[in-house]
Amino acid sequence: MSNYVIQADQQLLDALRAHYQDALSDRLPAGALFAVKRPDVVITAYRSGKVLFQGKAAEQEAGKWMVKRGADPGKRQERETASPPLEHRLEKLSAIGSDEVGTGDYFGPIVVAAAYVDRSHIAKIAALGVKDSKQLTDEAIHKIAPAIMETAPYAVTVLDNAEYNRWQRSGMPQTKMKALLHNRTLAKLVDAIAPIEPEAIIIDQFLERGSYFRCLADETRIVSDRVHCLPKAESVHVAVAAASIIARYVFLEEMERLSRTVGLLLPKGAGAIVDEAAARIIRERGAEALETCAKLHFANTKKALDIAKHR
């Protein structure tokens, strides 16, 4: 049996774990961080940074991550890292990206969007001016989002305020809400583009990957193949930036709809102007009107009640 040993830094260890996630083993030898078991190769990563490849495909698998030093391929070998950072390997792939909007806004829903960008369309989508939606004005969002939606397959899930408040009262933290919404949105898009399979699925990170999947333990369907949870993912792949823009576009549309319903232009965010708007709704429509347009557990609710009471 062929054995190959490579030395890995933390970045490479993370990349290895993500790449072989579907074959991770629960049985770990002493000193191991993780182990991978496939029919043709067993890979063991140790706390020391050593990674051992064993089996018929050991040379092939190790070669994906390292540059040969010219040693006898039949012997245990050391290799130098040549693998670029994970982010650089992902940016040119055909990928699904997902992002959410509305989690920090008192008024309005949470919107999760996912977009699929084929590698042949990356330049075209980027040329539309796609970047993190937080860097774009509302006017720019209304201009760019429809162009993205005409070009890239996408899926959207909206958690309205009434449902959000029910979930929150049941004890569900917002991080789990987001995990459920991302998973369901990804499932819709994966189905929509089938039989095409994305080479990667990139979630703008709000939880570490393990914590994200623990939130999905009770789901009947979990999208897990090739899923990466990465910070600032909108700068990793244009698909995430596209999803961010679509999510914000839908959020803005929902905010306009809610504003018409309550007869008041609802402000974004959770600052003092939001307290005043909520207090006005309470005075004009009653506190119960907030149930369908606001996230009631935010501190803004108490502040608005105090304002409405003393005016």
UniProtKB/Swiss-Prot annotation:
SUPFAM superfamilies: Ribonuclease H-like (SSF53098). Residues 93-310 form the RNase H type-2 domain. Manganese or magnesium. Binds 1 divalent metal ion per monomer in the absence of substrate. May bind a second metal ion after substrate binding. One of its GO terms (cellular component) is ribonuclease H2 complex. One of its GO terms (molecular function) is RNA binding. It is found in: Cytoplasm. One of its GO terms (biological process) is DNA replication, removal of RNA primer. A divalent metal cation binds at residues 99-100, 204. Endonuclease that specifically degrades the RNA of RNA-DNA hybrids. This is Ribonuclease HIII. The gene is rnhC.
